[in-house]
Amino acid sequence: MPKTLILFDFDGTIADTKSIAFKAYQVIAKHYGIEMESEAQMNALNQLSIKDRLKAYNVPLYKVPTLIKKSSEIMHETIQEAQIFEGMEALLRTLKARGHTIAIVSSNRKSIIEAFLNSHQLDIFDALIGKAPMFKKEKSIKKMMKHFHAKKHETIYIGDEVRDIEASKRLGIDVLGVAWGYDAQSLLKASAPNNLFDTVDDLTKYLLTL
């Protein structure tokens, strides 16, 4: 069935925010007495599930909202350093030109995402929802679908984390995983998205068949 509503995650899907996320990781790690000296350490953590990452830091689950708040503060100060993934702008503009509704549903702050989009002249999205619940992202996805009167078979979500895939599955919509973001490809594959792509070019070729 045609996909009229195409939803994107932001960090690790549209924007390469790993370098600024590393700065946030460093601050958080230092708070827990852990030295994080390289992005390789952060990438190693991304091979683990979120629960296992918290265990590695000895961080209780109830602390997650506080950590997210601190990370957001750091990202707000440094978002101008982030870059759009190569080929992503062309993909987004092509989808828009072909008549698709494109929107962002992200757990990041709306103000941070808007600052990035403005700096890259990406005023092409039909809507944006920020601060989507970390482990209940389907609530925000459902809200976006309702806004555009989109049915499940008309909607597809694209993200780089297992929680994106799990949220989409709980909602009953198709979901595409992308392996250039945060979660390791092995984790994404195990969560069984409808398709998993290694490059923006491969994703583009697929989306242009919809």
Residue ranges and their predicted role:
Residues 45, 83, 87, 108, ...:
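Short beta->alpha linker loops
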Residues 41-42, 123-135:
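A short, structured active-site edge motif that brings together acidic residues
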Residues 5, 138-165:
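Conserved Lys-Pro-Asp/Glu-containing loop-to-beta segment of HAD-superfamily phosphomonoesterases
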Residues 120-128, 187-207:
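Structural recognition of alpha->loop->beta junctions
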Residues 3-89:
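N-terminal helical cap/lid subdomain that shapes the substrate entry/recognition surface
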Residues 77-107, 114, 139:
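Short, acidic loop-to-helix structural element flanking the phosphoryl-transfer center
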Residues 98-100, 148-154, 210:
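Glycine-rich phosphate-binding loop signature in dinucleotide/nucleotide-binding domains
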Residues 157-197:
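Acidic, Mg2+-coordinating phosphoryl-transfer loop and its flanking beta/alpha structural elements
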